[in-house]
UniProtKB/Swiss-Prot annotation:
The chain crosses the membrane at residues 19-39, 56-76, 90-110, 113-133, 144-164, 171-191, 222-242, 254-274, 288-308, 317-337, 376-396. Keywords: Cell inner membrane, Cell membrane, Membrane, Transmembrane, Transmembrane helix, Transport. This is Multidrug resistance protein MdtG. It comes from the Bacteria.
Amino acid sequence: MSPSDVPINWKRNLTVTWLGCFLTGAAFSLVMPFLPLYVEQLGVTGHSALNMWSGLVFSITFLFSAIASPFWGGLADRKGRKIMLLRSALGMAIVMLLMGMAQNIWQFLILRALLGLLGGFIPNANALIATQVPRNKSGWALGTLSTGGVSGALLGPLAGGLLADHYGLRPVFFITASVLFICFLLTFFFIRENFQPVSKKEMLHVREVVASLKNPRLVLSLFVTTLIIQVATGSIAPILTLYVRELAGNVSNIAFISGMIASVPGVAALLSAPRLGKLGDRIGPEKILIVALIISVLLLIPMSFVQTPWQLALLRFLLGAADGALLPAVQTLLVYNSTNQIAGRIFSYNQSFRDIGNVTGPLMGAAISASYGFRAVFCVTAGVVLFNAIYSWNSLQRRRLATE
């Protein structure tokens, strides 16, 4: 029996890719709590300059990831997803190591851009699992996989803050590089993939990729949905701590309260994503998507009227439970509407839209709060999500009518 005939243990691959996504999510978020402090340590002084450079080094990673994702997705469809996971984990480990050695802000900015160019572990993990798991378990598997990155992103800032306090800022980058190298080793030794490389001549061009989709218009609407989900999430991030301070008044533990309120949606998503993914496998991911979007609107609006931090925390927990269903539902619908031959590119295009949302969301939130106040951010975000719910419902209805 040739290696390509050996059956794949997709459950083991799911477990290993979950660990990989967890480590990647943790590695990315380990450095987030002190990013402005490291920028300052590299010689940037003055309030406005520090704000500008902190924003640049944060956003440039997502911008370059959005540009590079389609290229890596195409390469994954030609060479296989496992090799892309290995490339991403090792590339990010090397870049993180170099970040700890940066001597000035320009070196650090270039390395942050390289991090975006070489990233892509999580979308490739999604593509790998999507092409191996039975279709009737796609929602559960992708929902479960999504909790890996969320778990890492939740624990990362806490661990990063503690490590920075004990060892200083630069050593955290070296620790992060070690975490990513462990991710590389796990992928190398434990993930299995049967993949027949495709020559460049045999690869479908973009126009052929679109033509091969069961419903190109629906797939585009799913990309837009991913973008809007990230815009909605990111729009609240810049103002959350300031809004909590406005609600709490003069309290000594504002950082702890803000951190807790920032993390509760992730905890709720951890609990809800696999369960709602499994429910989506039974009743259809399109129903889960629309209901979760409507619930998100109904939870965002009262956030602009809360009077205490604990009211905000409760609403954000419920919002996290609904949000935990959104991206897995989108990914499951992408699986249903594409073939394994183009899965790498479809998931990479989706990642590009997600990265664009990661950049534009905080910009939108900051602009609205500067002009109209913190509470207006939640109302505008609710309006954006409502538009997305209507747009998604119309796209799904058109698909249903087309198949009847």
